[in-house]
Amino acid sequence: MLTREIPAVTKNLLIINFIMFIATWVTENMGIDLTGLLGLHFFLAPDFHLYQIFTYMFMHGGLGHIFMNMFMLWMFGPVMEAYWRSRKFFFYYIICGLGAGFCQELAQFGQFYIICNEQVPGFTFADTMMEVRANQGLLNLWTTVGASGALYGILLAYGMYFPNERMFVIPFPFPLKVKWVIAGSIALELFSAIATTNDGVAHLAHLGGMLFGYILIKYWRKHPFMEGNGFGKYGGGWQNTGHKRKSW
């Protein structure tokens, strides 16, 4: 597995993410905050820009963060890119990343509204903009970075197309079917989103990437022209016709 060839899109995504991580570290020592520029800010914050919904997924918050994400991309990206082919894989990856960012923005708006409702007696939805103006500095601190949302979408796709494949997951000493790994991941992210509010992890972004990926796969399956290895006129790809498998 270590010597397998990494397909073009997966390889370029790995390279871009590592380049951006190094650039973030280098420019930080020069007094330039790339995370502040390219990370996804809360949409009511002064530093929010629309392009951040795209750029945030190529930024990471630390060595452990990028290592885990790129390991997931290296593990599952080549399989799905080989099955879908490059154009379709890239489209799916970006949609999951955008969807994750969108869900994170909704989650932050809900969090902001709850905080205001708890601290301001008689707070109503109409008072939101007044509170935004009063808390601009605080809102700028809400910044989301990472490819996790897109990668959770890739993980979901792997589970939907290859549900009975087995993989080792720490701390289990035996391999688990991928469909159970996916179910466990969803349950864990839901629990974490509800039970932990200050752990610094965008759990709802992870779930958002999975949600948008699920919707997209279901759409493709309802439109045979788009399903399987094809993507409209850009179809084609390998297919193991000698092996039958069940999928979700």
Which positions does each model-derived feature cover?
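A detector for small-residue-rich transmembrane helices and their helix-helix packing motifs
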Residues: 1-248
